[in-house]
Amino acid sequence: MHNFDFAKPSTIADAAKALAADGAQALSGGQTLIPTMKQRLAAPGVLVSLTGIAEMQGVCTGDGGLHIGAATPHAVVAKEARAHYPALADLAGGIGDPAVRSRGTIGGSIANNDPAACYPSAVLASGATVVTNKRKIA
């Protein structure tokens, strides 16, 4: 693995600023990124941790929908989404093993189009809107 700098912002604005740096890569669960780095297939100059950003964590309801932060682990999605979206909870509960479910995140799976997680298909099938710091993708 190559050397890298590490940033741990506490707000979305600070994360966006850190991610604007050349060679920066977002990190939350790291279930895809870290193995890729170990194989020397990726060499980001800066890892920007999203785990300390409260707005990117958890599952809540509001505005007629279910809101899931990108840094929310699969295990939390499996538990917290059950009452409102059982199919999504089942999907999240079937990803990997308990260790992967406790670290891997919904945002990482969607961003990497991870075929083992099936979240990209769930996003399309449910008509979900993905909200970033710059735009809404529906």
List PLM regions with ranges.
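C-terminal structural segment of proteins
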Residues: 1-138
